[in-house]
Design a protein with these regions (language model features):
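Catalytic-site neighborhoods of secreted/periplasmic enzymes
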Residues: 1-59
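A long, amphipathic alpha-helix that forms part
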Residues: 64-81, 120-169, 231, 374
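Short catalytic/ligand-binding loop motif for oxyanion handling, primarily in non-cytosolic enzymes
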Residues: 1-4, 23-26, 84-85, 94-101, ...
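Polar, surface-exposed loop/tail segments
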Residues: 62, 66, 70, 165-167, ...
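A short beta-strand-to-alpha-helix junction
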Residues: 134-146, 188-199, 209-226, 235-243
Length: 392
């Protein structure tokens, strides 16, 4: 419900919001809250302040936003399991940082750490040392175990009402988090390594009731909606780039040769499943770069007056998925710095931890051609090619 999420929840027939997660400005308190000495550099930020205000009211498991969210979702299933044609999204937010949970889960990972508080690590090179790094991993594991517990309640309810006979179940997440791997902590500031982008994904399809098997094909988050549309017998929009996962589920049939991924203003990346190619900007200025939007909001605030003063209205035919609706084109002067990492190529077969970039002009040329095609297929603006030094 932050500015950047405007109108998302209201597109559902019903929605429920659970407050108090992370730096949510939930409980009103003028005075700064008490908090322990910490290793985090966030301690003077408003999100840090709100988080520690909220923790004063989240002291038991049943008060945890995750518990309340899953409980609400389970209540929906309890009341609606006999109905047809329903869609439920349980968005737990966890195991997102801060990795705050209760002792019942912390005791699963005995920790002799006696240092300063560290359950909301800073993003950047890992400078915490061995003991603190191990501690934050245990904090993460504790929260992950809580997620496992509540996901188990969903599976139990699937069993209770035999929903497996006609209900699709999808378990996925948006991104990973680095906990000291390759000497990095956090996300967004480093290259898009496997720990960040190769995310867990589980799906059960009652039309193909296969259990306990893995698949080896490339898939992306954009493939979820076409899969759901097919399941509910809805024709997906013509401009949708994802593919139904049904062939993969049924017999491991591939649905794509490559996956294109990255972060705004950072590396543009492509993989064929073995090789990962990360293309950086061509120079430190990282230009030209624009944001395109019909709703000028960042995640937690509207675009500033200064930003909008530079905005121009884009050609209505620039993107066919906008159906000839105009969008703002806004210059961006600050973004993720990919130039300092340069362009990199990894072979996941011989180097799954991505510790040693390789140099192979034939593979790079091949992936460059595939990248250009996918960027065109995705209607990437022309300046994106210029930014990373590719000709269209």
């Amino acid at each position: 419900w932050q500015d950047g999420g405007s109108c998302y929840l209201t597109k559902f027939d019903s929605h429920e919001i659970v407050r108090g997660q992370q730096g949510d400005p939930w409980m009103g308190q003028v005075a700064w809250p008490d908090y322990p000495d910490t290793l985090s550099r966030r301690k003077n930020t408003q999100s840090w302040r709100h988080d520690w205000v909220n923790r004063q009211f989240i002291t038991t498991e049943t008060a945890m936003p995750q518990c309340k969210t899953f409980t609400s979702g389970l209540d929906f299933i309890e009341r609606n399991h006999n109905e047809d044609l329903w869609f439920l999204q349980i968005e737990a937010f966890d195991p997102h940082e801060p990795f705050y949970t209760q002792n019942e889960y912390k005791k699963l990972y005995p920790d002799n750490y006696h240092g300063k508080n560290l359950d909301w690590p800073d993003y950047g090179k890992n400078e915490y040392g061995e003991a603190a790094t191990r501690h934050v991993r245990y904090e993460y594991a504790s929260l992950m175990s809580m997620c496992d517990h509540y996901l188990g309640k969903v599976l139990d309810m699937m069993d209770k009402y035999d929903l497996w006979k006609d209900t699709m179940l999808i378990v996925n997440t948006d991104h990973g988090f680095m906990l000291g791997e390759k000497e990095w902590m956090g996300k967004n500031v480093q290259p898009m390594y496997e720990e960040l982008i190769h995310i867990p994904f589980f799906i059960y399809d009652p039309r193909n009731p296969i259990q306990g098997e893995r698949r080896n094909q490339l898939a992306q988050t954009i493939d979820i909606v076409p899969t759901l549309a097919e399941f509910f017998q809805i024709a997906p929009p013509e401009y949708m780039d994802g593919h139904s996962l049904t062939p993969v589920i049924r017999n491991d049939t591939p649905i794509r040769d490559y996956a294109l991924f990255g972060i705004f203003g950072g590396h543009i990346c492509i993989t064929d499943g073995r090789y990962v190619y990360m293309r950086s900007c061509k120079d430190p200025e990282n230009q030209p770069l624009y944001e395109y939007t019909a709703m000028p909001c960042h995640m937690d605030r509207p675009f500033s007056q200064e930003e909008m003063s530079e905005a121009e209205l884009c050609d209505k035919n620039a993107f066919n998925f906008m159906k000839q609706s105009g969008v703002f084109k806004v210059p961006v002067h600050h973004s993720t710095d990919s130039y300092r990492f340069y362009t990199m190529l990894f072979d996941l077969l011989t180097d799954p931890e991505q510790k040693c970039p390789i140099h192979d002009s034939n593979i790079e040329d091949h992936l460059c051609q595939a990248m250009k095609k996918m960027m065109k297929d995705n209607q990437a603006p022309k300046e994106q090619f210029e930014r990373i030094g590719l000709t269209e």
